[in-house]
C-alpha cells in the first residue's frame, strides 16, 4: 500500500515493501546520505525521466544537460520548434514536472535534465542530447568531479545509433575517452 509505505520516515517494512516493486522512482531532491539506505535497491532505482521514456513511445525527445545554461537552451529550442509549427512540450527541471506533461503523438519534448536525474537513469534514450558545459558543481552530492561528469555523460551512453549527441567543442577531450553509439556532433 503506497499511502502507508511513506507515512513516516521510519517505516519498519520499507525493505520488504521495496522488494515487491519493479521500480523505485527516486526524487532528485533526496540527498546522497538518504540514498545510502536504498543502495541495495540500486538496480530498481529509476528517475522521473526514465518513467516518461518507459510509458511514452511516440514522441521526439531533446534532453539538455550541463552545469549552466540548461533552462535558456531549453527555452530557445522550444521557441524555435514552435516557430516552425512543431508540437512542443517543455519540462523537467524547468516549468512543468516531466510526468505532468500531456504528451501527444509526434510531439517534441524538450527536457532539462540535472546531474541528479541522470545519475540514476537507465531508460532515457533521447533522440537529441545536448551537453553544454561542465564545471565543478554539486560535488557534495556526487562525491567528486568524475562522478559528476559521468552522470552528465550518461545520456549519451544510453543512446542508440540513430540518435544524436551534441557536445560543446570545449568538452571534446571528455568525449574522446568514451565510446557512444549515437552520432556525435561537436
Where are the regions a protein language model picked out?
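General small-molecule cofactor/ligand-binding pocket signal
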Residues: 9-12, 46, 89, 185
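NAD(P)-binding Rossmann-fold cofactor-contacting core
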Residues: 1-6
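Short acidic low-complexity segments
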Residues: 7-20
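Phosphate-binding loop of NTP-binding sites
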Residues: 17-21, 28-169, 173-181
Amino acid at each position: 500500500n503506497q499511502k502507508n509505505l511513506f507515512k513516516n520516515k521510519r517505516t519498519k517494512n520499507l525493505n520488504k515493501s521495496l522488494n515487491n516493486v519493479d521500480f523505485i522512482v527516486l526524487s532528485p531532491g533526496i540527498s546522497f546520505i538518504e540514498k545510502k539506505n536504498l543502495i541495495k535497491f540500486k538496480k530498481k532505482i529509476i528517475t522521473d525521466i526514465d518513467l516518461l521514456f518507459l510509458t511514452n513511445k511516440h514522441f521526439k525527445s531533446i534532453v539538455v544537460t550541463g552545469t549552466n545554461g540548461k533552462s535558456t537552451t531549453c527555452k530557445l529550442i522550444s521557441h524555435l520548434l514552435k516557430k516552425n509549427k512543431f508540437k512542443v512540450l517543455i519540462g523537467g527541471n524547468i516549468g512543468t514536472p516531466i510526468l505532468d506533461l500531456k504528451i501527444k503523438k509526434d510531439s517534441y519534448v524538450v527536457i532539462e535534465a540535472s546531474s541528479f536525474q541522470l545519475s540514476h537513469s537507465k531508460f532515457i534514450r533521447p533522440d537529441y542530447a545536448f551537453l553544454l558545459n561542465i564545471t565543478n558543481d554539486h560535488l557534495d552530492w556526487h562525491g567528486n568531479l568524475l562522478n559528476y561528469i559521468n552522470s552528465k555523460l550518461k545520456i549519451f551512453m544510453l543512446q542508440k545509433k540513430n540518435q544524436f549527441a551534441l557536445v560543446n567543442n570545449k568538452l571534446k577531450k571528455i568525449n574522446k575517452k568514451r565510446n557512444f553509439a549515437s552520432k556525435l556532433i561537436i
